[in-house]
Design a protein with these regions (language model features):
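Post-transcriptional modification and biogenesis factors for structured RNAs
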Residues: 1-157
């Protein structure tokens, strides 16, 4: 199954939407702390409805703890600074799709730790800055699922 990682997300409703997405697809959600909201934020619950109980959500105190938890998995960083299109990447069924915060994206130290080939972007108009985080996660996750439909770890669509 796919893994979604959010690095220090800031907006509770986005994370709630992503929880719902992960519950419906079976993707594992990794939340890398600190979060920009309280875990019991009513906006998080409202956006995620009652889906949190059906999602596999893993909390990590920091980047190092996250890396330890996903050791051995390929990490794809979604970034507006990526030189490769999502559609040029071959995403494995157990790979991690990493997204930065809504306000700052991924920090420079993470960019420095990853190879350029691991940094991918969603194609969009040159004058556009970025997509909403929960929308971007949905687009990328379903592309990864599409690429792995025949894998035993893919969800049944």
């Amino acid at each position: 199954m796919q893994h979604i990682a959010l690095y220090q997300p800031q907006i509770a409703p986005n994370t709630g939407n992503i929880i719902r997405l992960c519950a419906n697809t079976g993707a594992v959600l990794h939340l890398i702390h600190p979060l920009g909201f309280a875990w019991d934020d009513r906006r998080l619950r409202r956006a995620g409805l009652d889906y949190a109980e059906f999602a596999d959500i893993q909390h990590h105190d920091d980047w190092a703890a996250f890396l330890k938890a996903v050791a051995g998995r390929n990490i794809w960083a979604l970034t507006t600074k990526g030189t490769r299109s999502l559609y040029d990447a071959t995403i494995g069924a157990e790979d991690v799709l990493l997204f930065g915060s809504e306000t700052a994206g991924l920090p420079p130290f993470i960019h420095a730790e990853l190879e350029n080939t691991q940094k991918i972007r969603l194609p969009m108009r040159p004058t556009s800055r970025s997509l909403n985080l929960s929308n971007a996660v949905a687009v990328v996750l379903y592309e990864a699922i599409r690429q792995n439909l025949r894998a035993k770890t893919a969800i049944n669509l």
